[in-house]
Amino acid sequence: MATLTISIIVVFVLGYALIATESLTKVNKAAIALLMLVGCWTLYMVDPMQYLQLMHPDYTGGAAGMVEKVTGIIQEHLGDTATTLFFLMGAMTIVEIVDQNGGFNWVRKVMKTKSKRALLWRIAILTFFLSAILDNLTTSIVMIMILRKLVTDHKDRMVYASLVIIAANSGGAFSPIGDVTTIMLWNKGLITAAGVIAEIFIPSVVSMVIPALILQTMLKGELVMPEASAQQNAAVSDFTEGQRKAVFWLGVGGLIFVPIFKSITHLPPFVGILLVLGVLWTATEIFYRGLHRGQDAEGTQKRVTKLLSRVDMSTILFFLGILMAVSCLAEIGVLTALGQGLNVVFDGNHYLVTGIIGVLSSIVDNVPLVAGCMGMYPVAAAGDMAVDGVFWQLLAYCAGVGGSMLIIGSAAGVVVMGLEKITFGWYMKHISWIAFVGYLAGIISYWFIRTFLYAI
Protein backbone atom coordinates (compact mmCIF):
# COMPACT_ATOMS: atom_id res chain seq x y z
CA MET A 1 0.00 0.00 0.00
CA ALA A 2 1.37 3.42 -0.99
CA THR A 3 2.64 5.78 1.70
CA LEU A 4 0.16 8.44 0.55
CA THR A 5 -2.76 6.04 0.92
CA ILE A 6 -1.60 5.11 4.42
CA SER A 7 -1.37 8.82 5.30
CA ILE A 8 -4.97 9.41 4.21
CA ILE A 9 -6.14 6.43 6.27
CA VAL A 10 -4.19 7.71 9.30
CA VAL A 11 -5.85 11.13 9.02
CA PHE A 12 -9.28 9.48 8.86
CA VAL A 13 -8.58 7.14 11.80
CA LEU A 14 -7.12 9.97 13.89
CA GLY A 15 -10.13 12.16 13.17
CA TYR A 16 -12.46 9.29 13.99
CA ALA A 17 -10.66 8.76 17.31
CA LEU A 18 -11.04 12.46 18.18
CA ILE A 19 -14.76 12.32 17.35
CA ALA A 20 -15.11 9.24 19.53
CA THR A 21 -13.44 11.03 22.45
CA GLU A 22 -15.36 14.30 22.08
CA SER A 23 -16.54 14.07 25.69
CA LEU A 24 -12.89 14.05 26.81
CA THR A 25 -11.36 16.55 24.37
CA LYS A 26 -14.34 18.96 24.51
CA VAL A 27 -13.72 19.71 20.82
CA ASN A 28 -16.92 19.72 18.77
CA LYS A 29 -17.16 16.75 16.42
CA ALA A 30 -18.19 18.98 13.51
CA ALA A 31 -14.86 20.83 13.66
CA ILE A 32 -12.94 17.53 13.58
CA ALA A 33 -15.06 16.23 10.70
CA LEU A 34 -14.33 19.34 8.64
CA LEU A 35 -10.60 18.96 9.31
CA MET A 36 -10.86 15.30 8.24
CA LEU A 37 -12.50 16.38 5.00
CA VAL A 38 -9.81 18.93 4.18
CA GLY A 39 -6.93 16.73 5.36
CA CYS A 40 -7.96 13.65 3.34
CA TRP A 41 -8.61 15.51 0.10
CA THR A 42 -5.48 17.66 0.46
CA LEU A 43 -3.35 14.52 0.73
CA TYR A 44 -5.26 13.05 -2.21
CA MET A 45 -4.18 16.03 -4.33
CA VAL A 46 -0.48 15.36 -3.62
CA ASP A 47 -0.55 12.65 -6.31
CA PRO A 48 -4.07 12.21 -7.72
CA MET A 49 -2.92 10.49 -10.91
CA GLN A 50 -2.29 7.15 -9.17
CA TYR A 51 -5.85 7.14 -7.85
CA LEU A 52 -7.34 8.22 -11.18
CA GLN A 53 -5.60 5.30 -12.86
CA LEU A 54 -6.84 2.95 -10.12
CA MET A 55 -10.47 4.02 -9.76
CA HIS A 56 -11.10 5.62 -13.18
CA PRO A 57 -9.21 3.46 -15.70
CA ASP A 58 -11.16 5.03 -18.57
CA TYR A 59 -9.51 8.40 -17.89
CA THR A 60 -7.14 9.30 -20.74
CA GLY A 61 -6.68 13.02 -20.22
CA GLY A 62 -3.14 12.85 -18.89
CA ALA A 63 -1.62 15.41 -16.53
CA ALA A 64 -3.12 18.34 -18.43
CA GLY A 65 -6.71 17.48 -17.58
CA MET A 66 -5.99 15.95 -14.18
CA VAL A 67 -7.09 18.90 -12.04
CA GLU A 68 -10.29 19.31 -14.02
CA LYS A 69 -11.06 15.60 -13.65
CA VAL A 70 -10.44 15.61 -9.89
CA THR A 71 -12.54 18.76 -9.51
CA GLY A 72 -15.37 16.98 -11.30
CA ILE A 73 -15.00 13.95 -9.00
CA ILE A 74 -15.12 16.12 -5.87
CA GLN A 75 -18.11 18.04 -7.20
CA GLU A 76 -19.90 14.76 -7.93
CA HIS A 77 -19.33 13.56 -4.36
CA LEU A 78 -20.33 16.97 -3.02
CA GLY A 79 -23.52 16.79 -5.07
CA ASP A 80 -24.37 13.39 -3.57
CA THR A 81 -23.57 14.72 -0.09
CA ALA A 82 -25.61 17.89 -0.65
CA THR A 83 -28.73 15.85 -1.41
CA THR A 84 -28.41 14.30 2.06
CA LEU A 85 -27.72 17.67 3.69
CA PHE A 86 -30.68 19.42 2.04
CA PHE A 87 -32.90 16.47 2.93
CA LEU A 88 -31.72 16.72 6.53
CA MET A 89 -32.18 20.50 6.73
CA GLY A 90 -35.63 20.27 5.15
CA ALA A 91 -36.77 17.44 7.43
CA MET A 92 -35.43 19.16 10.56
CA THR A 93 -37.16 22.41 9.61
CA ILE A 94 -40.47 20.67 8.86
CA VAL A 95 -40.45 18.86 12.20
CA GLU A 96 -39.48 22.09 14.00
CA ILE A 97 -42.41 23.92 12.38
CA VAL A 98 -44.84 21.17 13.39
CA ASP A 99 -43.44 21.03 16.92
CA GLN A 100 -43.34 24.78 17.61
CA ASN A 101 -46.85 25.31 16.29
CA GLY A 102 -48.41 22.60 18.47
CA GLY A 103 -48.75 19.91 15.82
CA PHE A 104 -47.41 17.16 18.09
CA ASN A 105 -49.66 18.00 21.05
CA TRP A 106 -52.36 15.49 20.13
CA VAL A 107 -49.75 12.80 19.42
CA ARG A 108 -48.50 13.35 22.93
CA LYS A 109 -51.99 12.67 24.24
CA VAL A 110 -52.18 9.39 22.29
CA MET A 111 -48.73 8.23 23.46
CA LYS A 112 -49.21 9.42 27.03
CA THR A 113 -48.72 6.80 29.75
CA LYS A 114 -47.34 6.82 33.28
CA SER A 115 -45.36 3.61 32.82
CA LYS A 116 -41.81 4.09 31.55
CA ARG A 117 -41.72 0.59 30.11
CA ALA A 118 -45.10 0.92 28.39
CA LEU A 119 -43.88 4.11 26.73
CA LEU A 120 -40.71 2.32 25.62
CA TRP A 121 -42.71 -0.27 23.70
CA ARG A 122 -45.02 2.33 22.18
CA ILE A 123 -42.00 4.33 21.03
CA ALA A 124 -40.26 1.21 19.67
CA ILE A 125 -43.26 -0.03 17.67
CA LEU A 126 -44.19 3.40 16.29
CA THR A 127 -40.58 4.14 15.30
CA PHE A 128 -40.13 0.72 13.68
CA PHE A 129 -43.13 0.97 11.37
CA LEU A 130 -42.81 4.70 10.73
CA SER A 131 -39.22 4.14 9.59
CA ALA A 132 -40.40 1.64 7.00
CA ILE A 133 -42.65 4.31 5.47
CA LEU A 134 -40.42 7.33 5.94
CA ASP A 135 -36.65 7.05 6.11
CA ASN A 136 -34.82 6.40 9.38
CA LEU A 137 -33.43 9.95 9.46
CA THR A 138 -36.80 11.70 9.30
CA THR A 139 -38.38 9.16 11.65
CA SER A 140 -35.70 9.80 14.26
CA ILE A 141 -36.25 13.55 14.15
CA VAL A 142 -40.03 13.13 14.53
CA MET A 143 -39.71 10.66 17.42
CA ILE A 144 -37.20 12.80 19.33
CA MET A 145 -39.56 15.76 19.13
CA ILE A 146 -42.39 13.58 20.48
CA LEU A 147 -40.13 12.26 23.26
CA ARG A 148 -39.33 15.80 24.35
CA LYS A 149 -43.03 16.32 24.93
CA LEU A 150 -43.31 13.18 27.06
CA VAL A 151 -40.06 12.67 28.99
CA THR A 152 -38.47 15.43 31.06
CA ASP A 153 -35.61 13.43 32.60
CA HIS A 154 -32.65 13.60 30.22
CA LYS A 155 -31.11 10.31 31.38
CA ASP A 156 -34.33 8.45 30.68
CA ARG A 157 -34.69 10.25 27.38
CA MET A 158 -31.22 9.08 26.32
CA VAL A 159 -32.37 5.48 26.79
CA TYR A 160 -35.53 6.11 24.76
CA ALA A 161 -33.52 7.99 22.11
CA SER A 162 -31.09 5.07 21.83
CA LEU A 163 -34.00 2.73 21.19
CA VAL A 164 -35.25 5.17 18.55
CA ILE A 165 -31.92 4.74 16.72
CA ILE A 166 -32.11 0.94 16.89
CA ALA A 167 -35.81 0.74 15.95
CA ALA A 168 -35.42 3.25 13.11
CA ASN A 169 -32.51 1.34 11.56
CA SER A 170 -34.27 -2.01 12.01
CA GLY A 171 -37.51 -0.70 10.53
CA GLY A 172 -35.74 0.75 7.52
CA ALA A 173 -33.93 -2.51 6.73
CA PHE A 174 -36.98 -4.55 5.70
CA SER A 175 -38.55 -1.84 3.54
CA PRO A 176 -37.37 -1.03 -0.01
CA ILE A 177 -37.82 2.69 0.75
CA GLY A 178 -36.89 2.68 4.44
CA ASP A 179 -33.13 3.10 4.12
CA VAL A 180 -30.83 4.59 1.50
CA THR A 181 -29.02 1.24 1.10
CA THR A 182 -32.24 -0.71 0.48
CA ILE A 183 -33.25 1.97 -2.01
CA MET A 184 -29.91 1.47 -3.80
CA LEU A 185 -30.31 -2.31 -3.93
CA TRP A 186 -33.96 -2.04 -4.97
CA ASN A 187 -33.29 0.49 -7.73
CA LYS A 188 -30.46 -1.71 -9.02
CA GLY A 189 -32.82 -4.70 -9.20
CA LEU A 190 -30.83 -6.79 -6.71
CA ILE A 191 -33.78 -7.16 -4.33
CA THR A 192 -37.51 -6.94 -4.90
CA ALA A 193 -40.00 -5.17 -2.66
CA ALA A 194 -41.94 -8.38 -1.99
CA GLY A 195 -38.78 -10.40 -1.37
CA VAL A 196 -37.11 -8.09 1.11
CA ILE A 197 -40.34 -7.48 3.06
CA ALA A 198 -41.17 -11.19 3.26
CA GLU A 199 -37.72 -12.41 4.29
CA ILE A 200 -36.15 -9.53 6.21
CA PHE A 201 -39.22 -8.47 8.22
CA ILE A 202 -38.81 -11.11 10.97
CA PRO A 203 -35.02 -10.57 11.40
CA SER A 204 -35.68 -6.82 11.58
CA VAL A 205 -38.33 -7.32 14.27
CA VAL A 206 -35.93 -9.56 16.23
CA SER A 207 -33.15 -6.96 15.98
CA MET A 208 -35.50 -4.39 17.54
CA VAL A 209 -37.37 -6.50 20.11
CA ILE A 210 -34.32 -8.02 21.84
CA PRO A 211 -32.63 -4.64 22.49
CA ALA A 212 -35.99 -3.29 23.69
CA LEU A 213 -36.30 -6.17 26.17
CA ILE A 214 -32.82 -5.39 27.51
CA LEU A 215 -33.30 -1.62 27.57
CA GLN A 216 -36.54 -1.85 29.54
CA THR A 217 -34.51 -3.12 32.50
CA MET A 218 -32.85 0.33 32.58
CA LEU A 219 -36.23 2.00 33.10
CA LYS A 220 -38.07 1.62 36.39
CA GLY A 221 -41.00 3.38 37.98
CA GLU A 222 -43.36 5.91 36.49
CA LEU A 223 -42.83 8.94 34.31
CA VAL A 224 -42.96 12.41 35.76
CA MET A 225 -45.19 14.14 33.27
CA PRO A 226 -44.29 17.74 32.36
CA GLU A 227 -46.04 20.21 34.60
CA ALA A 228 -45.91 22.96 32.03
CA SER A 229 -48.56 21.50 29.74
CA ALA A 230 -50.92 24.41 30.32
CA GLN A 231 -48.15 26.88 29.55
CA GLN A 232 -47.21 24.90 26.46
CA ASN A 233 -50.79 24.96 25.24
CA ALA A 234 -50.87 28.70 25.84
CA ALA A 235 -47.62 29.08 23.95
CA VAL A 236 -49.16 27.54 20.85
CA SER A 237 -52.55 29.23 21.22
CA ASP A 238 -51.83 31.33 18.11
CA PHE A 239 -53.36 28.48 16.10
CA THR A 240 -56.72 26.83 16.59
CA GLU A 241 -56.97 23.08 17.21
CA GLY A 242 -57.92 22.57 13.57
CA GLN A 243 -54.95 24.60 12.35
CA ARG A 244 -52.57 22.62 14.57
CA LYS A 245 -53.85 19.36 13.13
CA ALA A 246 -53.54 20.82 9.63
CA VAL A 247 -49.90 21.69 10.39
CA PHE A 248 -49.31 18.16 11.66
CA TRP A 249 -50.82 16.41 8.65
CA LEU A 250 -49.17 18.75 6.16
CA GLY A 251 -45.82 18.12 7.84
CA VAL A 252 -45.88 14.42 8.73
CA GLY A 253 -48.23 13.50 5.88
CA GLY A 254 -45.93 15.38 3.55
CA LEU A 255 -42.94 13.39 4.80
CA ILE A 256 -44.83 10.17 4.08
CA PHE A 257 -45.60 11.54 0.61
CA VAL A 258 -41.90 12.06 -0.22
CA PRO A 259 -41.22 8.42 -1.31
CA ILE A 260 -44.38 8.52 -3.45
CA PHE A 261 -43.23 11.79 -5.03
CA LYS A 262 -39.86 10.19 -5.77
CA SER A 263 -41.41 7.13 -7.40
CA ILE A 264 -43.65 9.32 -9.59
CA THR A 265 -41.13 11.98 -10.65
CA HIS A 266 -37.86 10.02 -10.24
CA LEU A 267 -36.40 13.14 -8.63
CA PRO A 268 -34.07 12.85 -5.60
CA PRO A 269 -35.84 12.70 -2.21
CA PHE A 270 -34.57 16.15 -1.16
CA VAL A 271 -36.74 17.71 -3.90
CA GLY A 272 -39.81 16.15 -2.30
CA ILE A 273 -38.72 17.43 1.11
CA LEU A 274 -38.36 20.96 -0.28
CA LEU A 275 -41.84 20.65 -1.82
CA VAL A 276 -43.31 19.72 1.56
CA LEU A 277 -41.38 22.51 3.29
CA GLY A 278 -42.64 25.04 0.74
CA VAL A 279 -46.27 23.94 1.13
CA LEU A 280 -46.08 23.88 4.94
CA TRP A 281 -44.31 27.25 5.03
CA THR A 282 -47.01 28.80 2.80
CA ALA A 283 -49.80 27.32 4.93
CA THR A 284 -48.38 28.67 8.20
CA GLU A 285 -47.88 32.11 6.63
CA ILE A 286 -51.54 32.12 5.61
CA PHE A 287 -52.56 31.06 9.13
CA TYR A 288 -50.47 33.83 10.70
CA ARG A 289 -51.76 36.42 8.26
CA GLY A 290 -55.26 35.55 9.47
CA LEU A 291 -54.23 36.45 13.02
CA HIS A 292 -53.76 40.12 12.01
CA ARG A 293 -50.78 40.49 14.32
CA GLY A 294 -48.61 42.32 11.87
CA GLN A 295 -45.11 42.69 13.25
CA ASP A 296 -46.06 41.83 16.83
CA ALA A 297 -43.09 39.89 18.25
CA GLU A 298 -45.19 37.30 20.06
CA GLY A 299 -47.03 36.38 16.89
CA THR A 300 -43.94 36.04 14.71
CA GLN A 301 -41.65 33.96 16.92
CA LYS A 302 -42.93 30.70 15.46
CA ARG A 303 -42.90 31.77 11.82
CA VAL A 304 -40.56 29.79 9.61
CA THR A 305 -38.18 32.72 9.12
CA LYS A 306 -37.54 32.65 12.88
CA LEU A 307 -37.44 28.87 13.18
CA LEU A 308 -34.73 28.53 10.53
CA SER A 309 -32.23 29.86 13.04
CA ARG A 310 -33.01 26.87 15.31
CA VAL A 311 -31.74 24.30 12.78
CA ASP A 312 -28.62 22.63 14.22
CA MET A 313 -25.94 23.68 11.71
CA SER A 314 -23.20 21.83 13.60
CA THR A 315 -24.98 18.55 12.77
CA ILE A 316 -25.19 19.60 9.11
CA LEU A 317 -21.47 20.42 9.00
CA PHE A 318 -20.64 17.14 10.76
CA PHE A 319 -22.51 15.26 8.04
CA LEU A 320 -20.65 17.24 5.39
CA GLY A 321 -17.25 16.45 6.88
CA ILE A 322 -17.89 12.75 7.49
CA LEU A 323 -19.51 11.99 4.13
CA MET A 324 -16.86 13.85 2.13
CA ALA A 325 -14.01 12.23 4.10
CA VAL A 326 -15.51 8.79 3.45
CA SER A 327 -15.87 9.67 -0.23
CA CYS A 328 -12.11 10.26 -0.28
CA LEU A 329 -11.58 6.75 1.12
CA ALA A 330 -13.79 5.45 -1.67
CA GLU A 331 -11.75 7.33 -4.28
CA ILE A 332 -8.44 5.83 -3.12
CA GLY A 333 -9.88 2.33 -3.39
CA VAL A 334 -9.76 1.42 0.30
CA LEU A 335 -13.41 0.43 0.63
CA THR A 336 -13.37 -1.70 -2.51
CA ALA A 337 -10.16 -3.45 -1.44
CA LEU A 338 -11.66 -4.08 1.98
CA GLY A 339 -14.71 -5.77 0.49
CA GLN A 340 -12.60 -7.93 -1.82
CA GLY A 341 -10.34 -8.90 1.08
CA LEU A 342 -13.32 -10.00 3.17
CA ASN A 343 -14.52 -12.26 0.38
CA VAL A 344 -11.11 -13.93 0.13
CA VAL A 345 -10.55 -14.31 3.89
CA PHE A 346 -13.98 -15.84 4.56
CA ASP A 347 -13.95 -17.99 1.43
CA GLY A 348 -17.25 -16.69 0.10
CA ASN A 349 -19.26 -17.37 3.30
CA HIS A 350 -21.96 -14.78 2.72
CA TYR A 351 -23.22 -14.78 6.30
CA LEU A 352 -19.74 -13.88 7.56
CA VAL A 353 -18.98 -11.41 4.75
CA THR A 354 -22.23 -9.48 5.12
CA GLY A 355 -21.99 -9.73 8.91
CA ILE A 356 -18.56 -8.07 8.86
CA ILE A 357 -19.83 -5.47 6.37
CA GLY A 358 -22.60 -4.67 8.86
CA VAL A 359 -20.06 -4.14 11.63
CA LEU A 360 -17.98 -1.94 9.32
CA SER A 361 -21.09 0.08 8.44
CA SER A 362 -21.17 1.26 12.05
CA ILE A 363 -17.70 2.74 11.55
CA VAL A 364 -17.87 4.17 8.06
CA ASP A 365 -20.82 5.23 5.93
CA ASN A 366 -22.80 2.24 4.69
CA VAL A 367 -23.56 3.84 1.33
CA PRO A 368 -20.04 3.48 -0.16
CA LEU A 369 -19.76 0.02 1.42
CA VAL A 370 -22.95 -1.16 -0.26
CA ALA A 371 -21.99 0.63 -3.47
CA GLY A 372 -18.64 -1.17 -3.38
CA CYS A 373 -20.35 -4.54 -2.91
CA MET A 374 -22.70 -3.80 -5.80
CA GLY A 375 -19.69 -3.10 -7.98
CA MET A 376 -17.66 -6.10 -6.80
CA TYR A 377 -20.19 -8.90 -6.91
CA PRO A 378 -22.03 -9.68 -10.18
CA VAL A 379 -25.64 -10.83 -10.12
CA ALA A 380 -25.99 -14.55 -10.77
CA ALA A 381 -28.87 -16.35 -12.47
CA ALA A 382 -29.37 -18.56 -9.41
CA GLY A 383 -27.98 -19.17 -5.94
CA ASP A 384 -26.94 -16.80 -3.16
CA MET A 385 -25.97 -14.03 -5.60
CA ALA A 386 -29.23 -14.11 -7.59
CA VAL A 387 -31.90 -11.43 -7.27
CA ASP A 388 -33.36 -11.77 -3.74
CA GLY A 389 -30.55 -14.21 -2.96
CA VAL A 390 -29.05 -14.65 0.50
CA PHE A 391 -26.17 -12.25 -0.13
CA TRP A 392 -28.26 -9.28 -1.30
CA GLN A 393 -30.95 -9.68 1.35
CA LEU A 394 -28.39 -10.06 4.13
CA LEU A 395 -26.55 -7.04 2.75
CA ALA A 396 -29.75 -4.99 3.03
CA TYR A 397 -30.25 -6.19 6.62
CA CYS A 398 -26.64 -5.93 7.81
CA ALA A 399 -25.86 -2.55 6.25
CA GLY A 400 -29.03 -1.08 7.74
CA VAL A 401 -29.14 -2.65 11.21
CA GLY A 402 -25.34 -2.72 11.67
CA GLY A 403 -25.26 1.06 11.83
CA SER A 404 -26.93 0.94 15.26
CA MET A 405 -23.80 -0.45 16.95
CA LEU A 406 -22.13 2.96 17.09
CA ILE A 407 -23.99 6.23 17.41
CA ILE A 408 -22.17 7.70 14.42
CA GLY A 409 -22.80 4.56 12.37
CA SER A 410 -26.06 5.77 10.84
CA ALA A 411 -27.82 8.97 9.84
CA ALA A 412 -30.38 8.29 12.57
CA GLY A 413 -27.64 8.00 15.18
CA VAL A 414 -25.87 11.17 14.10
CA VAL A 415 -29.00 13.30 14.15
CA VAL A 416 -30.12 11.91 17.55
CA MET A 417 -26.59 12.50 18.86
CA GLY A 418 -26.93 16.16 17.88
CA LEU A 419 -30.50 16.65 19.08
CA GLU A 420 -30.15 14.90 22.45
CA LYS A 421 -26.44 15.62 23.09
CA ILE A 422 -25.63 11.93 23.57
CA THR A 423 -21.88 11.38 23.66
CA PHE A 424 -20.10 8.71 21.65
CA GLY A 425 -18.63 7.23 24.84
CA TRP A 426 -21.96 6.93 26.68
CA TYR A 427 -23.60 5.18 23.75
CA MET A 428 -20.67 2.81 23.26
CA LYS A 429 -20.61 1.89 26.95
CA HIS A 430 -24.33 1.42 27.50
CA ILE A 431 -25.94 0.70 24.11
CA SER A 432 -23.44 -0.69 21.58
CA TRP A 433 -23.36 -4.20 23.03
CA ILE A 434 -27.15 -4.28 23.21
CA ALA A 435 -27.45 -3.28 19.55
CA PHE A 436 -24.84 -5.92 18.66
CA VAL A 437 -26.83 -8.66 20.43
CA GLY A 438 -29.95 -7.67 18.49
CA TYR A 439 -27.95 -7.53 15.25
CA LEU A 440 -26.61 -11.07 15.73
CA ALA A 441 -30.01 -12.39 16.77
CA GLY A 442 -31.51 -11.04 13.55
CA ILE A 443 -28.86 -12.78 11.43
CA ILE A 444 -29.42 -16.05 13.30
CA SER A 445 -33.18 -15.79 12.80
CA TYR A 446 -32.64 -15.21 9.07
CA TRP A 447 -30.35 -18.26 8.90
CA PHE A 448 -32.91 -20.37 10.79
CA ILE A 449 -35.73 -19.34 8.45
CA ARG A 450 -33.68 -19.98 5.29
CA THR A 451 -32.22 -23.26 6.54
CA PHE A 452 -35.20 -24.93 8.18
CA LEU A 453 -38.47 -23.26 7.20
CA TYR A 454 -37.60 -22.84 3.52
CA ALA A 455 -36.39 -26.43 3.39
CA ILE A 456 -39.82 -27.77 4.31
Question: Where do the model's predicted regions map?
Answer:
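Membrane-interfacial helix-loop connectors
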Residues: 40-51, 78-79, 130-167, 171, ...
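Transmembrane helical segments that form the transport core of multi-pass membrane transport proteins
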Residues: 60, 79, 101, 108-110, ...
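Juxtamembrane and boundary regions of transmembrane helices in multi-pass small-molecule transporters
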Residues: 4-7, 153-154, 158, 174-175, ...
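Hydrophobic mid-bilayer segments of alpha-helices in multi-pass membrane transport proteins
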Residues: 6-15, 26-62, 81-93, 244-254, ...
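Hydrophobic alpha-helical transmembrane segments
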Residues: 9, 34-35, 85, 120-125, ...
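Transmembrane alpha-helix boundary signature
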Residues: 43-76, 92-109, 129-141, 328, ...
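Interfacial loop-to-helix junctions that mark the boundaries of transmembrane helices
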Residues: 1-4, 24-27, 55-59, 67-84, ...
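Alpha-helical transmembrane segments
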Residues: 79-89, 195-213, 265-278, 352, ...
